[in-house]
Amino acid sequence: MKAFKQKQVWFITGSQDLYGPKVLEQVAKNSEQIVHGFNESSAISIEVVYKPTVKSPREIHAVCQAANSDENCVGVILWMHTFSPAKMWIAGLNELSKPFMHLHTQFNAELPWSEINMNYMNTHQSAHGCREFGFIGTRMRKERKVVVGHWQSSDVQAQIDDWCRAAAGWHESQNLRIARFGDNMRQVAVTEGDKVAAQIQFGYEVHAYSLGELNEAIADIAEGDVTAQLDRYASEYQVGNELFGDEYQLDRLRKEAKIELGLTQFLTQGGFGAFTNCFENLTGMTGLPGLATQRLMANGFGYGGEGDWKTAAMVRIMKVMGQGRAGGTSFMEDYTYNFGATDQVLGAHMLEVCPSIAAAKPRLEVHRHTIGVRCDVPRLLFTGKAGPAINVSTIDLGNRFRIILNELDTVTPPQDLPNLPVASALWEPRPNLAVAAAAWIHAGGAHHSAYSQAITTDQIVDFAEMAGAELVIIDADTKIREFKNELRQNSVYYGLARGL
């Protein structure tokens, strides 16, 4: 079963009528076998759909238009089995609005040395057919992914899956609606941004709603539904006897369950995939949602604290991209440092860290929250599982958006955190904290990020290219002088590409 049940990527093979019916029959047969192989492979998470070989400008234009209008198609894979004169592709590529990958492969892995003849050469000539197609892509300034190698190779299939996941994320971005309850945290700069520019570039919509509208949805929740929700909590988390046995804590938990159900109903009925709130805008609320927000993220919603709609969008997009993969994705904040033999960052937030990143079964507890509405708030406590991860931040620079990515290694804390009443993750940034933090600050990265152990750097690279957005990467090879030069060069490039 593919992780993406209703999404598809179309496989389109280019050729021409020059070669005659026998060669074209072989081209079609080989293409169908490749598609079958992709669909049988557990390495590729999206259904690949075979499309008949295109041999003329009219056929190419028609299939590109069909891909554009198909709601389930998130992108197309293009392969030139034979030579397909690239002028035939101009109208179709001009029309194509879905992302496309250029797969540079051939059906047979090895040459049949003792049998090869000109018929074989004319049939299996992607080595130069794909170069012709590559030229027109470059000439038309088309952003695309190029994957090279035999189609049965595990590395090739991994690259295809990365791109397919990015295409699914891009499709989600084009259709995403984000609900904002309240505004940004007062006086904070980085969470601000141009929502119109974001919708033009990324596709997602951001809409604001009053706390009154949300409170009405919460008030409509039946007490029987609240009781059923508490039963779910008891079965899914570690819950001490004192929580359900204490009348006050139980009341706080019932209020939190009602918030969760009301939020879920509001977001679902409105077609929203992500939301934000702010501890400074909680009029009429019984508290800042803690457990409620954590569970909504665990169920796939994006979230951004203090009105951070850009991070909320990226959390949702990355959750979609990571479907079916081990690891999780969460809203996160760089909170405090551990300077020592290896410098580390303790990431957390007031309450809202997604349990999809937990190393063990989370504990459900009620603790005092002292920012905004001061009250006792139920929340899940855990530490993030060890392993490679990334932090991704999207910022608005005025004339463009920049995505910043830092590769990390999440580690197990050397000691317990008995007095920390929030979920957290401890990580070591690559190449080290000194370089990573300096580069992040030079790039203007936010204190919020989308943290993930399910998503790879390559997937974010593919997504950023689909969006036409600037991406800077902080990894094991980063050096500050080179990184600062990259930022300067990017400023010139994007200024010329889009206008100052």
Curated annotation (Swiss-Prot):
Q: Which InterPro entries match?
A: Ara_Isoase_C, AraA_central, AraA_N, AraA_N_sf, Fuc/Ara_isomerase_C, Fucose_isomerase_N/cen_sf, Lara_isomerase
Q: What is its EC number?
A: 5.3.1.4
The record's remark on the cofactor is: Binds 1 Mn(2+) ion per subunit.
Q: Which cofactor does it need?
A: Mn(2+)
UniProt key word Isomerase: yes
Report the GO molecular function annotations: L-arabinose isomerase activity; manganese ion binding
GO CC aspect terms: cytosol
Task: Please indicate if the UniProt record lists Zinc as a keyword.
Answer: no
Tell me the pathway: Carbohydrate degradation; L-arabinose degradation via L-ribulose; D-xylulose 5-phosphate from L-arabinose (bacterial route): step 1/3
Annotated residues for binding of Mn(2+): E306, E333, H349, H448
* Keywords in alphabetical order: Arabinose catabolism, Carbohydrate metabolism, Isomerase, Manganese, Metal-binding
GO terms for biological process? L-arabinose catabolic process to xylulose 5-phosphate
Organism superkingdom: Bacteria
Catalysed reactions listed for this entry:
beta-L-arabinopyranose = L-ribulose
Instruction: Name a Pfam family for this protein.
Output: AraA_central
> What function does this protein fulfil?
Catalyzes the conversion of L-arabinose to L-ribulose.
Q: What is this protein called?
A: L-arabinose isomerase
Annotated source species: Shewanella sp. (strain ANA-3)
Species classification: Bacteria, Pseudomonadati, Pseudomonadota, Gammaproteobacteria, Alteromonadales
